[in-house]
Amino acid sequence: MSLLLPSSTIVLDLKFVSLFKRIMNKTKLNNLQASLAANNFKKVIPDQESALKLLSEKKWHNGFVCSKCNSTNYCRGKSSYSRRCTRCKKIESATANTIFHRCKIPINNAMEIAYLVCNVSAISSYEISRQLDIRHMTCYGFQKKVLNCMDGKSEEDLLQNILEQVQGEVSRL
């Protein structure tokens, strides 16, 4: 016994297959873009030390100002790239009062997530998770934080400055 399908069903199936192929090709392209972007980023910022150095340079490019007493005098803090106000003794890390404040993942991974979100069109948190080998919900949470920052829901000029410098160095490679 043979089952005959109406010709409209075959046309719909062909349209579905065509749409599915386009979606898969776009997904492969995004995965390739994400992979290339991640490799380029790792050449510029390979470890936490270089990420903290870049963050501190961008954060205090106009000089240190204590967030507690507004003093501009400081000395080196306990941890690397932190500063201690000589007036009130408050220690401020490079990540304090930035989008990277209280970030539970390494700072270089957090910067890489921000870089991927800003430079790869429509990248999913699943793809970021796969690229960086970090839990999906961690990537989702930080991706959401970056997107809120980009939408103007928080006043983070620092993120834009950091990403512009990284983009400039990546383009030189």
Provide a role label for each language-model segment.
Residues D13-L173:
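Residue-level recognition of single "structural anchor" positions
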